[in-house]
Amino acid sequence: MRYTNVSILLGMLVIFVSPMVFADDLTPIPEGKPQVVQWFNTHVGPLAQRKGLDPALVAAEAAPRIINVNPKGGEFKTLTDAIKSVPAGNTKRVIIKMAHGEYREKVTIDRNKPFITLMGQPNAMPVITYDGTAAKYGTVDSASLIILSDYFMAVNIVVKNTAPAPDGKTKGAQALSMRISGNFAAFYNCKFYGFQDTICDDTGNHFFKDCYVEGTFDFIFGSGTSMYLGTQLHVVGDGIRVIAAHAGKSAEEKSGYSFVHCKVTGTGGGIYLGRAWMSHPKVVYAYTEMTSVVNPTGWQENKTPAHDKTVFYGEYKCSGPGSHKAKRVPFTQDIDDKEANCFLSLGYIQGSKWLLPPPAL
């Protein structure tokens, strides 16, 4: 009789207690694309199923505030005004729901306004657009969207810089789409358009999933520690074209860019996967489809020969005609399973502490 009661009690616990997800920083993203969804759902579950998140984040997510923005009229007509309504020192998640339309604004989210989410609809994505250039604002401040705060999230939005493409003659023609300088930022199904320096992936831990990034030269650059999962990297224009310019300056730095299950596309050919803007760049492409637009050498030759020994350019189980390694530069690392796992798990971006899925609204 005693054992029967215990069995009943255990059964009730199974029914009524929700499973808790301890996000695993060690389990790598699987090689098979069909398994990626299950991997994500297992390790990036919603707040109610999670343990180990930062306490400040848990408190912030307890009672989110929702703001509606619509250029045609609503609670706020501009994104800038909506952000101004968030108090300095904010401690609560603020979800800014953006109606479909064009938001011609130069938007900055200050460091003292964490926990902000910009959210659009997947079939009617709002567009943040501006035409700032380095000549007017300085390179990193030319971005249409600048995020300085922590715990930022963007879902289903488009960000553009509509300044003309640099012609190689005009000084200060760099024009950023976005600069992300805050820690713990996630981007889901977002699109970024620019030419040179499209995204300044500046500093902090960042996660991009199912995104699209378009540019010409160094169009993802900075010192961020970022994972790009299932993201299309589309190269346009002509002349020398480079995707990633990671700004690592020493062997001790932990930052770097990891591109996983991405796709490299573009016009023309001769595209470089990355270059040594600084002495110690760290860039890895894993399970990535590389079309014929990729230069057979893969990576741009280093202008400083000493950098041949300090760069970390890794390729792991990539596919497509652009992934052939016969003509790769000699300083490319063909990394093994153990090395690859460091760039394939959430631990690379400290994901178990902060990474949440998009809000279900």
UniProtKB/Swiss-Prot annotation:
InterPro entries: Pectin_lyas_fold (IPR012334), Pectin_lyase_fold/virulence (IPR011050), Pectinesterase_cat (IPR000070)
Keyword Ligase: no
Protein location: Secreted, Cell wall
Catalytic activity line of the entry: [(1->4)-alpha-D-galacturonosyl methyl ester](n) + n H2O = [(1->4)-alpha-D-galacturonosyl](n) + n methanol + n H(+)
Signal peptide limits: 1-23
Cross-referenced Pfam families: Pectinesterase (PF01095)
Expression across tissues: Expressed in mature pollen grains in the anthers and on the stigma. Found in pollen tubes within the style.
Protein name: Probable pectinesterase 48
Name of encoding gene: PME48
